[in-house]
Each structure stands twice: as structure tokens, then as C-alpha cells.
């Protein structure tokens, strides 16, 4: 297959972080609005906002986000950013995307939780109207933050009723803040009866993924540890959990030291629910087209595999039932 074939394939993305996926041109635009100086050379700028090909750890990978935080402190900036990420996705034939972000990281200059969600949803709607993509927002609680602050943020977010804000996630430092450490926050979100996904299995800790499965969470970000844990993989499959796999990101952070440590083939053989994602388009210097190329290169994934994974993604998405029906029909037509 050639690159153009991968580009043309209709795609679904469930795991994409807003602040890790801004295009360089949008980063420059936002810096201008915030009156923040940036390196004039794109290659130099890229070094600040793209993580090394191999990082020492997940925490080193997360350092790239510090550069973006000051740029996302106004309604206008968040709207521009959300539009940019959804546009990037649409231009590579992504027909549905969930973009996740942490309101806390955009509240340094006085924005409220509600204002951040409204601004992101506005940007996503602009992209939907312009490009025909369906784009939704997820709100992340930061697991390493003060829990009383996170609890307030989650409660305020839950008051927002916007059809483009569809669920919750917990992101950040998994290693030091596993599910048990933030269990009250997880239970708080579960009490809302709104969809939730959860980062687990990215830092080499099988217990964290096991805990998230035991808590009844049906979508999991990364699940990388499954490559080494056959019994946990059985539980993952038995409980119908869907994995949001992020190959390039996992290789960067050493969640998977080599391609052989990535769980895709074992998950596929076990009949697990698999989706393919970028995680962070800019921080990982990737997009879904590149990810599909890598799956084909390393795992011999076929067009039929991509069709199956995209169907899984639609079924596991937080879209409405009507939107899922529409997306499944669009996907079937695109792959026929």
C-alpha cells in the first residue's frame, strides 16, 4: 500500500489531547495573541513542542506540554486550538474525533471551567460546520493535582449541558497517582452517569489497569502493559474493555521499549476491542495516517483490520446513538 491509500482511509480517533496536538502555525498564532516570544525558526520551535524520539520516561514526555500551557489561557485561544486540531483530523479523513483537554490547565488567568468547555466546543463546532467531521470534547481531571480542586472542576464541568461535550477522562502522572489514589474522584465521575475513559497501563503497572477494570471503566487509554500480562488481557477481553492504543507515543515514553513490547498483536489474537490513536499529534510528531502506516509496517495490518478497528471505535465512542448510526454507515460506504 502507498501513503496515499492510508491517507484516504476513513478514520476514527478516540484519544487525542488538545494541548499536545496544535499545529506549528496555530502555536505561532496563539503566541502572538498572548504576546509571547517564540523561536523564529520552525525547527527550533519544533524542538520545544515535540518530545524526543525516545524519552527517559513519561514524565519527560509530558514536559513538552509546559511550553503550550501559557498559550491556552483565553476563550479565543481555546476556540482557535480546538478548531485547529479538528481541522487537522478532518484533512486526513478522520470522520469522528474526541479531543480531550484539562480545564485546570487553562484557568491560570481567570477562566472558569464552564468557559473553557464552551470555548473548546465552539472551536469543534466551527470545524464540524466547515469540514463535515463530527468532533466532541472530553474533560480531563489531572490526577496529580489537589483533589479538592479537581473535584470542584469535575462538578462544574458536569453542570455543562452541551451536545459536543460528551465525557470525562483522568490524565497526568499515572505512576504516582494510580486508580486507588484517586478513587473518590473516579466514583464522583461515575455518579454523574456520563461516559468516562481512563489512562492506565502506560507506566508498567499492571495493578493500575486491573484496578480500572475492577472499577467498571470500559475504555482505557494505552493499556500498554497488556503485552506482558496474559491473565490481565483475559480480564480485559472478558469485561469488554476497549483499548485506545497509541503506538508512536508509547515508543517515545518507553511504555513499550520496542515494537515487540506493544500489545497490539496479542490483543488482536485475544479478540480485544482495539482502536488506533495519535495521543498527541505534535508532541509525538504524528497523525493517524502515519500511525496506520506503522501498523501496516510492523504488524501487517490490512484495510480490513483498519475497518474493524474503526467500527470498534465508533461503538466505543461517546457519540449519540444517532451519530453512531450515521458514522457506521459512512464508514461502511468508505470501506466498500
From Swiss-Prot:
Top-rank taxon, per record: Bacteria
Residues noted as binding Zn(2+) in the record, renumbered to the chain: 15, 17, 199, 279
Catalytic activity: adenosine + H2O + H(+) = inosine + NH4(+); 2'-deoxyadenosine + H2O + H(+) = 2'-deoxyinosine + NH4(+)
EC number annotated for this UniProt entry: 3.5.4.4
Free-text cofactor note: Binds 1 zinc ion per subunit.
Main EC class the enzyme belongs to: hydrolase
Cellular-component GO terms for this entry: cytosol
Active site: 202 (proton donor)
InterPro entries attached to this UniProt entry: A_deaminase, A_deaminase_dom, Ado/ade_deaminase, Metal_Hydrolase
Binding site for substrate: 17, 19, 172
Site (Important for catalytic activity): 222
Keyword Zinc set for record: yes
The UniProt record lists the keyword Zinc: yes
GO MF assignments: 2'-deoxyadenosine deaminase activity; adenosine deaminase activity; zinc ion binding
PANTHER family, per database record: ADENOSINE DEAMINASE (PTHR11409:SF43)
Family, similarity comment: Belongs to the metallo-dependent hydrolases superfamily. Adenosine and AMP deaminases family. Adenosine deaminase subfamily.
Function (record text): Catalyzes the hydrolytic deamination of adenosine and 2-deoxyadenosine.
Official protein name in the record: Adenosine deaminase
Species of origin: Streptococcus thermophilus (strain ATCC BAA-250 / LMG 18311)
Gene name as annotated: add
